[in-house]
């Protein structure tokens, strides 16, 4: 059965992909799931510099589920391009990079640095409330 789909001009072999923020860049799950079966891997947020994320505790159980506030922890774009992109390119899947930042110039910096990286798409993260700026989503701040 043909399960191909086209997303923003990029053909995926199927519509199954990870969601940003939950799958790292796939290395952590390589032994549990066959990444070659995914249409795409959507990475955790990648910033222009390493981000430590929020202090612990980051996860709590609540009635009916769990809440997390990781805070966009990540290695930064340089480490991502050297370590994660080559790992992902070993697999037959598209790479969608979630780009995050604290300012417009942060986003531009990451996008420009990724221009020569072998990635298929970019996803712009403008809605993560788990950052120190008072919890306001970047996309809701009129100053941005």
Residue spans for each PLM region:
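Flavin-dependent oxidoreductase catalytic cores
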Residues: 1-144
């Amino acid at each position: 059965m043909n399960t191909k789909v086209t997303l923003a001009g990029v053909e995926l072999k199927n519509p199954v992909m990870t969601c940003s923020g939950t799958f790292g860049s796939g290395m952590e799950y390589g032994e549990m799931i066959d990444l070659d079966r995914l249409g795409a891997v959507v990475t955790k947020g990648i910033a222009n510099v390493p981000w430590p994320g929020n202090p612990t505790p980051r996860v709590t159980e609540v009635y009916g589920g769990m809440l997390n506030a990781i805070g966009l922890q990540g290695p930064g774009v340089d480490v991502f391009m050297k370590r994660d992109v080559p790992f992902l390119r070993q697999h037959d899947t598209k790479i969608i990079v979630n780009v995050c930042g604290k300012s417009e110039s942060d986003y531009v910096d990451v996008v420009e640095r990724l221009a020569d990286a072998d990635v298929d798409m970019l996803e712009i993260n403008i809605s993560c409330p788990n950052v120190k700026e008072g919890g306001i989503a970047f996309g809701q701040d009129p100053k941005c």
